[in-house]
C-alpha cells in the first residue's frame, strides 16, 4: 500500500538511509518550486545544532517540503501575489492543508521579502477560494469542467476539487491570516476579498447552527466508502439546534457520525475571535466584529454545556462528536483539529484538567482508533482504517506534551517509522512502517520540521541530541 505518487520526487528515497548515506532527498535545486533564503538559513542553523545524523537529515528533507514541491507562486491579473498550494500527490488546494503547510514559514517572513509575498499570496488565494464557495474543502487551480468529483450530488462548480463541508476549512485561513498579520504587521491582505470572505464564513457558520432549518448544503456520492457520503438525503444525522455548528465532514474528509464535531467547534471559537480583532483594528468594521464575537461566545457556551462526557475511567472528558440530543461519540481521529491537538491550535489550555483527562483517553485502547504495535503507537482513523497509525498524532502528542521523556519517545518513534525515506507519511502499519500510505504528503512533512524547529527554539537541543 505504499503509494508512490510522483516518481521524480520519491524514486530514490528508499536506499539512502539504509546504507547510512544521509544525502539529501530534496529535489535538485533547479526543480524546487520555491526557494527562500530565510528557510535555507534556518535549515543550515538547525542542522549545525543537531548531532543525530538521521534526525538532521530528516529535518532538512521535511521542513522545506511544502516550498520544494507544492508552492505555485505567481502574480494575479490584479498584480497581487497569488499562491496555489498542492497538498502533495493530489494536485488540488485544500484550505486546511495549505493553511497548515505554510504555517511554520510565517515566523521567518520578516527575514525574506519573497517568502512574505508568497505567504500573502496563499492568504489571498484562500480568501478567493472561500468566495467561490465557502462550503468546499478543496479547490482546483482554475476551472476544471471534468474534475474528479464533478458527479457528486451537491452544488458542484468546476473550480472545486471537492465540496465537503468541514468547519475547519474556514478556520485555517483565519488562523494563518491572523498569525501573518501579528508577525509582519502587513494589512495589505485585508481588503475587499477579505471582507467578503469573513462575511461568507460568518453566514456559513450561522446557517450550519441549523436554527432556521437545515440550510442550503447537501452532499451525496455514489461510492463504496460509507464515510464519503451523507445519510438522510445528503443532510447527515439530525442535530438539535443548541448553538453548536454542524460539520458534515471531519478534517480527514470522512463524514461525521454526530454532526457537532467538538474539536472543530473549539477551533471556530478562537478563529472568530481572531477575525473580530482584525475587523476591528484594521477595517474598523465594529458591527461585524461584534457579530463574530457573539457567535464565538454562543458556541463556547454550548461547548461547555454539551461537549463533555463523564467517563467511568478517565473522568470528565471532551467527546469527539455530539448531537445536542445527549448522544456522544467517544474517539479521536489523527487529523488536526483533533481532541489531542486542541492546545497546539490554541483552542484550549494544555493545563485544562478536562483536556488532560481527554489526552489520556485518546492515547489509550479506550479510543477505538488508537493502535499499538511492534513499530509504534498512535491514533489513526477510519480514513485509512484498522492498525494504521498516523505520524500526525505522534507529532501532536509531542506538541502538547509537558514531559521531556514523552517528547523524546515521540521523536524517536517518528524517526524509526519513516521506512528509510527521510520523510513522513500519511499513515504506517503499527507493525511494519514499510507498509505506509502517501509517499508525498507535504502537510505531515512540514509539520515534522515545525516540531523539530519548535523544540530547538525552546532550548531542547540537548534532548534531541540524546536520541540514539
Language model: regions and residue ranges:
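Extended ligand-binding clefts on enzyme/binding-domain cores
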Residues: 95, 131-135, 139-142, 148, ...
